[in-house]
Amino acid sequence: MARLKVTQINSGIGRKQNQRETLRSLGLHKIGQSVVKDDKPEFRGMVNTVSHLVTVEEVD
């Protein structure tokens, strides 16, 4: 299964509550922080919600 590296590039301050909560559920707390997760539909949906706040890379 593919894995994705998600890095927070913008702050959640001033964003809608669901976007802030999505960042937290992804495990992102600070700008520049990265997490590696399995590529699942649930995860993709969370990334799409905050796509303007994160970057996504595929990791082997």
Swiss-Prot record:
Domain of life (superkingdom): Bacteria
Family to which this protein belongs: Belongs to the universal ribosomal protein uL30 family.
Subunit relationships: Part of the 50S ribosomal subunit.
GO terms, biological process: translation
This protein's GO CC annotations: cytosolic large ribosomal subunit
Protein name as it appears in the record: Large ribosomal subunit protein uL30
Species classification: Bacteria, Bacillati, Actinomycetota, Actinomycetes, Kineosporiales
Keywords: Ribonucleoprotein, Ribosomal protein
Gene: rpmD
GO molecular function: structural constituent of ribosome
InterPro entries found in the cross-reference section: Ribo_uL30_ferredoxin-like_sf (IPR036919), Ribosomal_uL30_bac-type (IPR005996), Ribosomal_uL30_CS (IPR018038), Ribosomal_uL30_ferredoxin-like (IPR016082)
Pfam families linked: Ribosomal_L30 (PF00327)
